[in-house]
Amino acid sequence: MTTRTSPAPAGLLRPSLHCLAFAVALGSAGAALAKDVTWEDIANDDKTTGDVLQYGMGTHAQRWSPLKQVNADNVFKLTPAWSYSFGDEKQRGQESQAIVSDGVIYVTASYSRLFALDAKTGKRLWTYNHRLPDDIRPCCDVVNRGAAIYGDKVFFGTLDASVVALNKNTGKVVWKKKFADHGAGYTMTGAPTIVKDGKTGKVLLIHGSSGDEFGVVGRLFARDPDTGEEIWMRPFVEGHMGRLNGKDSTVTGDVKAPSWPDDRNSPTGKVESWSHGGGAPWQSASFDAETNTIIVGAGNPGPWNTWARTAKGGNPHDYDSLYTSGQVGVDPSSGEVKWFYQHTPNDAWDFSGNNELVLFDYKAKDGKIVKATAHADRNGFFYVVDRSNGKLQNAFPFVDNITWASHIDLKTGRPVEREGQRPPLPEPGQKHGKAVEVSPPFLGGKNWNPMAYSQDTGLFYVPANHWKEDYWTEEVSYTKGSAYLGMGFRIKRMYDDHVGSLRAMDPVSGKVVWEHKEHLPLWAGVLATAGNLVFTGTGDGYFKAFDAKSGKELWKFQTGSGIVSPPITWEQDGEQYLGVTVGYGGAVPLWGGDMADLTRPVAQGGSFWVFKLPSWDNRTASR
């Protein structure tokens, strides 16, 4: 039984960080002929099958492919085409979604590494290994979730709070920008996003920051992809100042920040937590070109302790901790907030709001079509929000036994909380408050691992988990570089027969159409295809395929280590390929209490696997 009340020390997360940044070019003559990636290529990523150019497999992040050469009738013949090992002792969690461009796979790995591989053979073309300092502060393993590509460059973030642009053909550094102090806990784990501002016509590189568990102020950035120069920065704590073209622009929300308590004895006039209030947008953004809006999740407030963000003797419901634990619509021209919807006001449970925002056409019960976002939150509720204005359209639970709220009020958009679910402060003379049993726990009904949406079935395929936690308050004060939580916890089982639950959800009725249970937590993303298939990976190392309509398991392959990444698919030379990054790690083994014990037997790893139908059997591959 394991109890953790703070992130694992940085030194425990890495065998060695004395590595040189380098690029090894192998076969650069052929790579030099590769075409540049245009905005039109990226805008049509979800419709074209030869490349995968965006995190989410398109600007709408649906993770749906029109490919159907591999289908429910022949997937049982799916066979490994090749695998590539990331090598050396640097394993840990491998959460990367690969991208594919012009026959080259770009896949990031733990410890801020990036590999370019021949998509057909797995031959390494080049490697970039970022030099990391000893004092990085990753909360949840040394992961990286992917890269972006545009023009002749590939971009990714690093654990020392930097963004790097590499020549996509050679791996050589084009530019490198530091955006924050890694010693204070800032990192970058999410894949950047490429968007085109509909007003100015400029193509922008959008990225966020990580570090809410260390008391950072979350920030979203826009950069010139050619030079790396910052165009704007938007903080996600109310009352903090943004930047535009290198100068102060506007504060986020109300300059007086009424959603955070005042403190007349503080130099800022606000409580300590306001200066370290979190809200980090550490996942990748989606982009709605029709309304010219960047849509991204905002992280949990800092600290986790609700009473540190509530006036003494006050009610947490009077202090929402804006703009945290919600989804934000941002103007790409200026970085101004266009709209905000908060999933968990004054979030007391580290539910965050960073899970992906999937853009889709929502057909309401009255037949009206709404251009919407879909979001399965860590708090256990599934949200459908009008992406033109941030107004709630529908909300329902997607996991069992939610304790903290009974439902979401569709008129007010706010949760209806249950009494006693905000853990109380310690009694006088006590270090810890009374523990409360909460579900979902802070790791969520679903965490960062992205769901998929099928344009054929109209269903969302959600990689959920059933678990709970004992949760209690502790004393908290800010120290640079130290965990800023004010809470203790122990995660526990909910059911004896499973933790993971892959669920097909109807976004209109809120009903579970089918469910597949897994013994271990699900931490991999999901892919849906026109072949009536759904793919995901499991904690015990299986890459699996399911019938999208019935949920029947049709195929599986043991990769040798747990899978905690989103799969992809593409077409090359008339053949459909599927790829997935393999290597167990991430937050569960570090923070997961009883769940960490459950997953301890899983071997670590670091590799990329590619599958296809046997070439000799493409014409006859059917039952």
From Swiss-Prot:
Reactions it catalyzes: a primary alcohol + 2 Fe(III)-[cytochrome c] = an aldehyde + 2 Fe(II)-[cytochrome c] + 2 H(+); ethanol + 2 Fe(III)-[cytochrome c] = acetaldehyde + 2 Fe(II)-[cytochrome c] + 2 H(+); butan-1-ol + 2 Fe(III)-[cytochrome c] = butanal + 2 Fe(II)-[cytochrome c] + 2 H(+); propan-2-ol + 2 Fe(III)-[cytochrome c] = acetone + 2 Fe(II)-[cytochrome c] + 2 H(+)
PROSITE patterns the record matches: BACTERIAL_PQQ_1 (PS00363), BACTERIAL_PQQ_2 (PS00364)
GO molecular function, one term: calcium ion binding
Keywords from the UniProt entry: Calcium, Disulfide bond, Metal-binding, Oxidoreductase, Periplasm, PQQ, Signal
InterPro entries, A to Z: ADHI, PQQ_b-propeller_rpt, PQQ_MeOH/EtOH_DH, PQQ_rpt_dom, Quinoprotein_ADH-like_sf, Quinoprotein_DH_CS
Protein's GO biological process: ethanol catabolic process
Active site positions: D350
Signal peptide: 1-34
Entry keyword Calcium: yes
SMART domains tied to this protein: PQQ
Disulphide bridges: C139-C140
Positions annotated to bind pyrroloquinoline quinone: E95, R145, T189, H207, G208, S209, R378, W523, A587
Names of required cofactors: pyrroloquinoline quinone; Ca(2+)
Keyword Disulfide bond among record annotations: yes
Protein residues bound to Ca(2+) 1: D45, T48, D51
Residues annotated to bind Ca(2+) 2: E213, N300, D350
Role summary: Catalyzes the oxidation of ethanol and other primary alcohols to the corresponding aldehydes, except methanol, which is a very poor substrate. Uses a specific inducible cytochrome c550, encoded by the adjacent gene in the locus, as electron acceptor. Is a key enzyme of the carbon and energy metabolism during growth of P.aeruginosa on ethanol as the sole carbon and energy source. Is also able to use secondary alcohols as well as aminoalcohols like ethanolamine and 1-amino-2-propanol, and aldehydes as substrates.
Family annotation (PANTHER family): QUINOPROTEIN ALCOHOL DEHYDROGENASE (CYTOCHROME C), QUINOPROTEIN ETHANOL DEHYDROGENASE
Subunit-structure text: Homodimer. Interacts with cytochrome c550.
Similarity-based family: Belongs to the bacterial PQQ dehydrogenase family.
Name of the protein in question: Quinoprotein ethanol dehydrogenase
Organism: Pseudomonas aeruginosa (strain ATCC 15692 / DSM 22644 / CIP 104116 / JCM 14847 / LMG 12228 / 1C / PRS 101 / PAO1)
Lineage: Bacteria, Pseudomonadati, Pseudomonadota, Gammaproteobacteria, Pseudomonadales
